[in-house]
From Swiss-Prot:
Gene name per UniProt: milt
Domain of life, source organism: Eukaryota
Chain positions with Phosphoserine modification: S831, S918
One Pfam match: HAP1_N
Organism, as annotated: Drosophila melanogaster
Sequence ranges of Basic and acidic residues compositional bias: 9-26
Additional remark text: Was named 'Milton' after the blind British poet.
The protein's name: Trafficking kinesin-binding protein milt
């Protein structure tokens, strides 16, 4: 069996009908009808008709409703055809006999009878089949009728029908294949039959011709044997036919065997083909699955290829950009290298010049010191004459001077006249009327009790003809008239806050000096020296000169009535001072004059027997001016109704541009005040702001919870000063809380009111109000002194960095980025510490709160029972609070070893130590004088002790600290206590505050011990509850600042320095900053004093950031200290 295409099957379906028709025609032509062929042809026709009818019925869909019926009929017809088509041997022999009989004997009638029998058999079979189909159809209809009522049975039947249908389709396909094969075989056999029939006809014809020939031959040869010839021919023909039949039988058998063998081979081939088809289908399925997988992989590879292409394009663009930037940066690097080379060359040249200038500066400074020493000696020699009689000396020497010493039209005469005898100025202003000034001077000279001196002599010798000088020749009057229109115009409120929370402001009107006129010149100076005009420049403020800081006078020898003066001062009350000021402010013009005594008819004889020019501490002219009365029996601190600023400096043309440039240069100069103050619009290159450093700004105008804001002198700024003298006034806590604004004119009042909201308010140092008594507690401070004058007045010794030597070694560089130090190079020279004065001030403030002075101790002893009930609250002034905050910052600096950055030089210590204090600061609690031999070694800070004292609420300090502090407090002006703060421990880095532990020198040990033993036992007691409250408030404020600022990290622009616990991080351009365990020089003495506290301190990031700012101040490009 072979597989054929369905198309070929459909094409060959109609071929058997045509072939059968042709066979019938051929058989009809020959006149022979075979039994097998007739029945087969009829069955073929019937099957063909049945197939055509079935196909027609299937197409129309009228009779057959199921494909199963069609398949059943087709199978039945094809099975019948297959059975009837089989040819047996008997049939073949019968056909041969019929053919042989027809050839020999003609047409035989048996063929007709055989065909009738076959047709009857076929009709009976068809009737049986039709009957069977009717029975099956009836059974099927009955089954379908019963099954329609059961849905499950219908479902099962449908499933069975589906399975039967599939089986029927498969069987139909196989049958169609077999039918096609059989049809092909039938066609071949018919062809063979035709050929055999032709051969047989040809043979019959030949046989007939031969028989005729034989008969002719026989007839011609043997005429007499006519009776025997037919018999012989018959016998010959029979033998031939018999042999032919035998051969055909043998051939038939061989063909059957061959057909059987071919059928077996065909089955084997078909089985092999089925196996091949199964294998091919399996391989095709595998190939399809592999194709799908490869398609997915190919899609994924395409997506990856697309992404890689995009990345390649992006990277190519970036590479091109990077190459361009590399080229640009290479060019910039070359330019920067060339600029760096040039900068290094300039830096080296500038360093050499700086070293040369430093050497010259040292020489000049040495000459200045020698000149100052000589000047001091000269003043001491002339001191007794100034004490005995100030103007009397003038009178005695007046005859010798004649009229040539002071020309009447000279500027010197006008300056002397305005500074000594002005009636309309605060300290040394210009008089309003020259003629009235001359008259007043003559009246004063007449009242002076100098025996041989007269007004005519004084007027003729010293100020001869002063009143006769024409007005147009007087310089001050001309300048006054020229500058009267713009005298009080506001030229910009420029404030610069100096260290210590004292403010300076440039105000309207003439500029006043930032430094007070030396008060000692009125006590010690001679007649010619004290009358001279002294001008202090900015260079003299930076020098270590005693000219601006005169020594404290030991009493007033030669001045009669000193004891009475002291008694009068003790009896003076704040109410009287306020009343006197009010009278002087609002009295009519001419009411109070210098030529009229104060106490005519009133019996007021206080302040009598004082020399002319001697000032009292409570006088309004105590620090900057000298008021003189009309006689030696009366001393007046009053002035006339109107206080006006001096107008001396109007001889200089005002230059606003110069003032602006001076202000800019002052802002650009880095100072430590920049760390504590916020200056809007001004930044330090490489520095960081207060927020980055973890600090907050507290101004003097901030109202804190335990400080009242009703203190006097805080609402208005004092008049600004430039280059000459200083206005000053005494502010005492017991003077009440009334704002005295009488010293301001109307225009100044309006300008001050307008600038109050934008400028910082200077404040006088407020002390705790222990009582209304002012015994031994009066100290005079200037309101608007400069930084140097303020520090000197408070007993603080400070040296400006410009006056100190800077290292000039090979590894020193003055620029902002010095050269790197080579390996093995010696360490750079150390500079003196600029924070020495501030530390001493802070130590004084702590000492005031812990120990207290003798007067407060006496009051606490008297009111010990009352203090237990009332719990008096401790008050800190703004200056003290500012100093404590400054000390906290300084403590962070010294915890990482500030002494290694700017350490004190032994050679310059003597200059700082030999500087004397102001006479105004001798009675204050801050007068801790430094000695020349113990500036570094006599004092250090013991944080452990002070921390314990602060935690105990300032109740009971340790015995050593208490005794030393008590001794220092009781030492007074006569005892010199060593309190230098240039060396202190940095092992403990806590932020609770600084504690000063005084190490008394050997020479001062007996004195301090005796003083400490003389103090009462209750001298160091204080209010514990208030102290603890204050301590907790300070700690809370500190913790809030730390949390808010987040402990700022290191400065990336200034590099990193070694902390207290680390090592190895070195900035080569700033030198090495050693930690607490690596400093050898300073740790030697500390290890002797504190051997148990030599452990490493933890690093602090705030400290590192602060040191970064300090380094920018020290090594900054624009005016750094070093």
């Amino acid at each position: 069996m072979t597989h054929v295409n369905n198309g070929e099957v459909m094409e060959k379906e109609m071929e058997p009908t045509g072939e059968r028709e042709r066979d019938r025609e051929t058989a009809a032509g020959s006149g022979v009808h075979h039994r097998f062929l007739a029945s087969a042809s009829e069955r073929d026709a019937n099957s063909g008709n049945a197939l055509e009818a079935a196909a027609t019925k299937t197409k129309t869909g009228t009779t057959i409703t199921n494909l199963e019926d069609l398949a059943f009929e087709a199978c039945q017809n094809w099975s019948d055809l297959h059975q009837d088509f089989f040819i047996t041997d008997d049939e073949l022999e019968y056909e041969d006999e019929l053919s042989l009989g027809s050839s020999i004997g003609g047409n035989i009638a048996t063929t007709t009878t055989a065909d009738a029998a076959v047709e009857g058999l076929i009709t009976g079979e068809h009737q049986n089949e039709q009957l069977l189909m009717e029975v099956l159809c009836g059974n099927r209809v009955s089954q379908m009728t019963r099954a329609y009522d059961d849905i499950e049975a219908v479902t099962r039947l449908l499933e069975e029908k589906e399975k039967d249908l599939e089986l029927t389709v498969q069987i139909g396909k196989e049958l169609l294949t077999q039918n096609n094969a059989l049809e092909a075989r039938v066609a071949d056999l018919e062809t063979d039959l035709k050929a055999s029939n032709d051969d047989r006809a040809q043979l019959v014809h030949e046989l007939h011709k031969k028989n005729e020939l034989i008969s002719v031959l026989t007839n011609d040869a043997d005429d007499g044997t006519d009776t025997d010839t037919p018999t012989m021919s018959k016998s010959i023909t029979l033998d031939l036919l018999q042999r032919k039949v035998n051969s055909l039988l043998d051939e038939n058998k061989s063909l059957k065997c061959e057909a059987t063998q071919l059928a077996h081979q065909t089955d084997e081939v078909e089985e092999h083909e089925r196996q091949l088809m199964a294998d091919i289908s399996a391989q095709l399925n595998d190939a399809n699955s592999q194709y799908d997988n490869l398609s997915l992989e190919l899609e994924r590879q395409r997506e990856e290829n697309r992404l890689q292409h995009e990345q390649i394009v992006n990277l190519t663009a970036r590479l091109a950009e990077a190459e361009m930037r590399l080229h640009q940066l290479t060019q910039d690097n070359d330019e920067h290298l060339s600029l760096l080379h040039v900068t290094k060359e300039n830096q080296n040249a500038l360093a050499l010049e700086l070293v040369e200038f430093k050497q010259r500066y040292e020489e000049v400074l040495a000459l200045l010191h020698s000149a100052q020493d000589q000047l001091k000696q000269q003043r001491k020699r002339s001191q007794p004459q100034a004490r005995s009689s100030f103007l009397g000396g003038l009178g005695t020497s007046g005859a010798g001077m004649g009229g040539s010493l002071f020309p009447p039209d000279s500027l010197h005469c006008e300056l002397m006249e305005s500074s000594l005898y002005s009636e309309n100025s605060l300290d040394s202003g210009i008089s309003g009327d020259s003629q009235r000034s001359a008259d007043r001077i003559s009246r004063m000279m007449m009242h002076m009790p100098s025996g041989g001196m007269s007004s005519s002599t004084m007027g003729g010798s010293v100020y001869a003809g002063a009143g006769n000088v024409p007005p147009y020749k007087r310089v001050f009057d001309t300048v006054r008239c020229a500058g009267k229109s713009g005298n009080y115009m506001d030229s910009g409120n420029v404030s610069m806050t100096q260290l210590g929370a004292m403010s300076m402001s440039s105000s309207s009107g003439p500029r006043m000096a930032s430094m007070a006129y030396p008060a000692g010149s009125y006590y010690r100076g001679g007649s010619n020296q004290s009358l001279g005009v002294k001008t202090l420049s900015s260079e003299s403020l930076n020098s270590q000169s005693d000219d601006g800081y005169p020594a404290q006078p030991s009493g007033v020898p030669g001045a009669p009535g000193a004891k009475e003066l002291e008694a009068a001062l003790k009896r003076l009350t704040p109410a009287e001072v306020l009343a006197r000021r009010a009278m002087l402010s609002y009295a009519p013009a001419g009411t109070y004059n210098y030529d009229e005594p104060m106490g005519h008819g009133t019996g007021n004889v206080r302040n009598s027997d004082l020399p002319l020019g001697v000032r009292t501490p409570d006088s309004i002219m105590s620090t900057g001016s000298s008021g003189m009365s009309g006689s030696t029996n009366h001393m007046s601190a009053s002035m006339t109704h109107q206080w006006r600023l001096p107008e001396k400096l109007q001889i200089i043309k005002p230059m606003e541009g110069s003032q602006t440039l001076h202000h800019w240069s002052r802002l650009a100069t880095p100072t430590l005040s920049g760390l504590l103050d916020e200056r809007p619009g001004v930044t330090i290159r490489g520095g960081r702001g207060l927020d980055d450093l973890g600090m907050q700004i507290y101004t003097l105008s901030d109202v804190e919870e335990d400080v009242s804001d009703d203190l006097p002198g805080k609402q208005f700024e004092a008049p600004g000063c430039t280059f000459t003298y200083t206005n000053s006034m005494v502010m005492h806590p017991d003077d009440g809380f009334v704002n005295d604004l009488s010293f301001l004119s109307q225009s100044q009042m309006s300008s001050r009111m307008a600038s109050t909201s934008t400028s910082r308010q200077p404040s006088c140092p407020a002390t705790p109000r222990a009582g209304l008594s002012r015994k031994n507690s009066c100290s005079t401070f200037s309101v608007n002194l400069g930084l140097a004058g303020m520090l000197n007045e408070r007993g603080i010794k400070a040296v400006t960095p410009s006056a100190l030597n800077t290292p000039a070694g090979p590894n020193f560089s003055p620029t902002v980025t010095p050269c790197n130090s080579p390996e093995g190079s010696p360490p750079r020279a150390q500079s003196p510490e600029p924070l020495f004065g501030l530390l001493s001030c802070g130590a004084d403030l702590i000492r005031r709160k812990i120990v207290g002075d003798q007067h407060q101790q006496q009051q606490q002893k008297q009111r010990s029972s009352l203090s237990k009930q009332q719990q008096q609250k401790i008050m800190l002034s703004h200056l003290e609070r500012r100093a404590l905050r400054s000390l906290n910052l300084i403590e962070k600096v010294e915890s990482i070893g500030l002494e290694n950055i700017i350490s004190a030089q032994r050679g310059l210590g003597s200059g700082i130590a030999n500087r004397s204090s102001s006479p105004l600061s001798s009675g204050s609690l801050q007068s801790l004088h430094t000695s020349s031999n113990s500036i570094v070694d006599d004092i250090h800070f013991d944080r452990a002790q002070i921390k314990g004292v602060l935690h105990r609420g300032l109740k009971s300090p340790t015995p050593a600290t208490a005794s030393t502090s008590a001794a220092a407090a009781a030492s007074g002006p006569g005892i010199s206590t060593s309190s230098s703060t240039s060396a202190y421990n940095s092992d403990d880095s806590d932020d609770q505050g600084l504690v000063m532990k005084i190490k008394p020198s050997k020479s001062a040990t007996p004195t301090t011990t005796g003083a400490a033993q003389s103090q009462p036992s209750s001298a160091t007691t204080s209010n514990g509850t208030a102290s603890e409250t204050r301590l907790k408030q300070m700690q809370r404020q500190k913790s809030r600042r730390q949390l808010k600022n987040g402990m700022a990290n290191q400065r990336p622009d200034l590099g990193t320095i070694s902390g207290a616990g680390g090592g190895g991080r070195v900035r080569p351009d700033l030198g090495k900053v050693a930690d607490s365990g690596s400093s050898s020089k300073l740790s030697t003495k500390r290890s002797e004093a504190k051997p148990a506290e030599e452990e490493e301190a933890t690093p602090q990031t705030i400290t590192q950031a602060f040191v970064g700012s300090v380094s920018s101040l020290l090594f900054g490009r624009k005016g750094g200290w070093l």
